[in-house]
From Swiss-Prot:
GO terms, molecular function: undecaprenyl-diphosphatase activity
Pfam families, A to Z: BacA
Organism: Syntrophus aciditrophicus (strain SB)
Lineage of source species: Bacteria, Pseudomonadati, Thermodesulfobacteriota, Syntrophia, Syntrophales
EC assignment: 3.6.1.27
Protein name in the entry: Undecaprenyl-diphosphatase
Amino acid sequence: MKKHHLRHALLVLSAAILLAVSCSFSAASASASPPASEKKIAVWEAAILGVVEGITEYLPISSTGHLILASHALGMTQFSETRGPLGTLMVKNDAMDSYNIVIQLGAILAVLGLYRKRVKQMLKGLSGALAVLVSRRSVTALGDSERQGLKLLGLLLLAFLPAAVFGKLFHEVIETYLFGPLPVVYALVAGGVLMIGVEYFFWLKDRNRLRISDVNSMFYRQALFIGMMQVVSMWPGTSRSMITMIAGLIVGLDMIAAAEFSFLLALPTLGAATLYSGYKNWHALDDSAGMLALAVGLAVSWLTAVIAVKALVRWLTHHGLIPFGVYRILLAGVLLIYFWQWR
């Protein structure tokens, strides 16, 4: 996997969004278009959303911001007549929201496959710990690999906990007041500036600092800090991968370890969101998408996520996050221009 593959992935993403935007103009000229809440997702639309989800979920550029743009361009979401404290909001569409969350399963499966050795290590550690408890033996009976796997599992669960609690308490508030163009634009710009600043001050200017290169060598306080920072990503447009990667750099991980922990942390975080949303809105999801569209979205999301993760790791080995920060700021400008015409 070479660095030009990341450029190819971004070109595919741009093409998918441009196709969606062009469809929005043709749909706008058609008078018989159904309301977004009644629109059934076509297979080709599912493929576009799968590309957008798969590429943007792990790149630090905000999957939510891209999905809001693509969903609206495809006529699947609409603006509300009411305004929130940060401007116009999107009409709540449980089926569409659930579809965007459920196709995250493709991205989850991508990380499960790419980091299967880490996953096996954690499962081995968990099974070893359970065996020790059942047999009432000492924890010292665990092997080195089992102890490392158990520790990594503990690090991930600790980092996942803040988002789980905050999400349960404030999920409705976030959906009610923050799912709109301006909150996403603010988050894209703030995240872009933050990414550029953190890389400059915590990475480029601190090259000689001894950093952790193996996630198994992390301390629990570092995992907790990353988890607390992950809460910020619940603001639409922030990017979960962006905020967790820069949090990793701040606490002393090197670039690759920060990315790896971010990818692994996606397993419980995205997994919980996918299961909850799929269970809660399954009937609406089945009515609006259908099994074929859902399967296509999942498959495309998985394939593009595999490509994106491999390309990102290769890119970060030789480059950094600053180009993504610049991209976020440019994307914010595109979103402002696009949504201004629909005001």
